[in-house]
Each structure stands twice: as structure tokens, then as C-alpha cells.
């Protein structure tokens, strides 16, 4: 089968930095144990499973404050998605050692919210409800940040502030953000724009929007909790016009999807381990509709291949 390996795809620098920070923590014998990650360090189960094998435990829950209640001692790592000041304060009051793996692009948004709050603004924040990144951003200044996910949410807003700015979650589809921002502008003509789609997300979406047009099908390799992975599938269908499926790894691929498909495009979310994506590409490249021996779907990437290698400091 012909395979279009969409480029760029896969890991972004924020994800790599977060994983290196956590990997170094696992090697640091001076850190108090146990070591916990407050939520998924990045949204990929293969990554969290690999860290657990290294003795770093991922805690899950409805929000970061609730998750923190599970921790009585040791070290906590804040994920790439960022946390609110309230979570940081709660960890400090518990006497926990904290390690911050927040993506620099997320930190920029937090800094923006602090800045405009001091200047008397309210903020309309476009993001996915229930996702940890908006949770952290709204938590920076909950009294002035208004979370919206849809154009209907915008219509339901009742903001009286004279100074208003609109910004967004870094991993949203830039086309969705544009449409919602237009709705905001229609309701609040004086609003100021500050789009925060991170560059890695933007170029990956643009690559899919162009390169997937040449394929009969797009496969996005990414975790179901990964917002940017889900958005890539959306971009393939809505912008490139190519049917798309998101899979966590090769074991989730369905052979019936490949019926009547001659060319398949493959991309991966920003938190998807490269070996997982390569395994999918290898399968598709050798797949032959007429040869059943090429139809075996087997995930075989060991966990030790998932995490980045780091140098041990002497």
C-alpha cells in the first residue's frame, strides 16, 4: 500500500521537555519518594505506562486539586498542560517537592492572563471543557476568565467589562478557533485578539490540511485523550476532505477501514511516541489486500523504547 508520511508529525518540543524532566526525576535519588505525576504528563497511555515502569506513578481524577488530595508525601510533577496557582499553593502547603513540566507555550498564556488582569481586562478563553490546559488557565484568574468551547457558549456569555481580550487553548484546531473568535467579535466588536495556537500544533494541522488531500484515508496515531490528535483527524475530514481514524497504536487499526484504499496518509499527535507511529507505518507499507499474510495486526513496541534517553549526570 502507498503511504504518505505526513511531515511534520509527532513529538513537539514541549512534550519532549516534559518527558525529559520526568525521566531525570526518576533518576534523581535525592528526590523524596514516591514520585507522582499530577494527571498524565502528556496525553499518551504508552508514555504513562513507561514512566510507571520507571517508578513514577500517574494519578488521575476530575481536576488537579482533587488529584492532589491523593498525595500525602513525596514529589509531584506538574504536567505539560500547566496548573493553576491554587494547585501550586496546595502542594506547597502539603510540604511536597514539586517539579514543573509545563509547556513554555502554556506558560505564555498564563502570563498573558496575569498581565491583562492587572490592566482591568476580562478574558474569553476558547478551550475544551474538562481538559487540564483550560483548567489551569482559567485557574490563573477565575473571576475574569470565561471558558467557551462552542459558538453557542459565546452567545450565552454576559460580560459587562469594557476591556476584553480573547485567547485560546494551544492545541485547538486553528479553524475552530477562527470561527469562535469571529462569533466573539460579532458579539463584542471591541474585543482584542490574542491567538495562542502553538506553532507545533499549527504546522502539523497545516501539513494534514494539504498532504492528506492526496490520500484515500488518513490514520492519526494518538491517544484518545490527546486533544491535538483528535483535532488532526478533524482537520483531515473537514479541511482536506479525507476520511480519518485516530488509533492509539497498531492494535486499534481495523482492516475494514483499508477496503478500497490505495493510498493512506499517516500522521501522529504531539504526544505520540515515534516508535508507535513507525510500527503503524511499517504495517501499512507492507499491507497487501490480496495477501492475508500481511494482515497481522500486532503491537510489539516495548515500554523501554518509549521514553527519551537522558544522560546521567555525575
UniProtKB/Swiss-Prot annotation:
A single GO BP: dimethylallyl diphosphate biosynthetic process
Cofactor remark from the record: Binds 1 [4Fe-4S] cluster per subunit.
InterPro entries found in the cross-reference section: LytB/IspH
Pathway annotation from the record: Isoprenoid biosynthesis; dimethylallyl diphosphate biosynthesis; dimethylallyl diphosphate from (2E)-4-hydroxy-3-methylbutenyl diphosphate: step 1/1; Isoprenoid biosynthesis; isopentenyl diphosphate biosynthesis via DXP pathway; isopentenyl diphosphate from 1-deoxy-D-xylulose 5-phosphate: step 6/6
Catalytic activity: isopentenyl diphosphate + 2 oxidized [2Fe-2S]-[ferredoxin] + H2O = (2E)-4-hydroxy-3-methylbut-2-enyl diphosphate + 2 reduced [2Fe-2S]-[ferredoxin] + 2 H(+); dimethylallyl diphosphate + 2 oxidized [2Fe-2S]-[ferredoxin] + H2O = (2E)-4-hydroxy-3-methylbut-2-enyl diphosphate + 2 reduced [2Fe-2S]-[ferredoxin] + 2 H(+)
Binding site for [4Fe-4S] cluster: 12, 103, 198
EC number per UniProt: 1.17.7.4
A Pfam short name: LYTB
Active site, per annotation: 133
Residues annotated for (2E)-4-hydroxy-3-methylbut-2-enyl diphosphate binding in this entry: 43, 81, 131, 170, 226, 228, 271
Names of the cofactor(s): [4Fe-4S] cluster
NCBIfam families: ispH_lytB, PRK01045.1-1
Role of this protein: Catalyzes the conversion of 1-hydroxy-2-methyl-2-(E)-butenyl 4-diphosphate (HMBPP) into a mixture of isopentenyl diphosphate (IPP) and dimethylallyl diphosphate (DMAPP). Acts in the terminal step of the DOXP/MEP pathway for isoprenoid precursor biosynthesis.
PANTHER family, per the entry: 4-HYDROXY-3-METHYLBUT-2-ENYL DIPHOSPHATE REDUCTASE
Name of this protein: 4-hydroxy-3-methylbut-2-enyl diphosphate reductase
Amino acid at each position: 500500500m502507498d503511504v504518505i508520511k505526513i511531515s511534520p508529525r509527532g513529538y513537539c518540543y514541549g512534550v519532549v521537555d516534559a518527558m525529559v524532566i520526568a525521566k531525570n526525576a526518576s533518576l534523581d535519588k535525592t528526590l523524596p519518594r514516591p514520585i507522582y505525576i499530577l494527571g498524565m504528563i502528556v496525553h499518551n497511555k504508552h508514555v504513562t505506562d513507561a514512566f510507571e515502569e520507571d517508578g513514577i506513578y500517574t494519578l488521575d481524577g476530575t481536576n488537579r486539586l482533587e488529584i492532589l488530595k491523593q498525595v500525602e508525601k513525596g514529589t509531584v510533577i506538574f504536567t505539560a498542560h500547566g496548573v493553576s496557582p491554587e494547585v501550586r499553593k496546595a502542594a506547597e502547603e502539603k510540604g511536597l517537592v514539586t517539579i514543573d513540566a509545563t509547556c513554555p507555550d502554556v506558560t505564555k498564556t498564563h502570563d498573558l492572563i496575569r498581565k491583562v488582569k492587572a490592566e482591568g481586562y476580562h478574558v474569553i478563553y476558547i478551550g475544551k471543557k474538562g481538559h487540564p490546559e483550560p483548567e489551569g488557565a482559567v485557574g490563573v484568574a477565575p473571576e475574569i476568565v470565561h471558558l467557551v468551547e462552542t459558538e453557542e457558549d459565546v452567545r450565552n456569555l454576559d460580560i459587562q467589562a469594557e476591556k476584553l481580550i480573547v485567547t485560546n487553548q494551544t492545541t485547538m484546531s486553528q479553524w475552530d478557533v477562527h470561527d469562535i473568535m469571529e462569533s466573539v467579535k460579532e458579539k463584542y466588536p471591541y474585543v482584542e485578539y490574542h491567538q495562542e495556537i502553538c506553532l507545533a500544533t499549527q504546522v502539523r494541522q497545516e501539513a494534514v490540511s494539504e498532504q492528506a488531500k492526496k490520500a484515500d484515508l488518513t490514520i492519526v496515531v494518538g491517544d484518545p485523550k490527546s486533544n491535538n490528535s483528535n483535532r488532526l483527524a478533524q482537520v483531515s475530514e473537514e479541511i482536506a476532505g479525507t476520511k480519518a481514524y485516530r488509533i492509539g497504536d497498531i492494535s486499534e487499526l481495523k482492516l475494514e477501514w483499508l477496503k478500497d484504499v490505495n493510498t493512506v496518509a499517516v500522521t501522529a499527535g504531539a504526544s505520540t511516541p515515534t516508535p508507535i507511529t513507525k510500527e503503524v507505518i511499517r504495517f501499512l507499507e507492507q499491507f497487501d489486500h490480496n495477501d492475508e499474510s500481511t494482515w497481522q495486526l500486532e503491537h510489539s513496541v516495548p515500554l523501554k523504547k518509549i521514553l527519551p534517553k537522558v544522560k546521567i549526570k555525575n
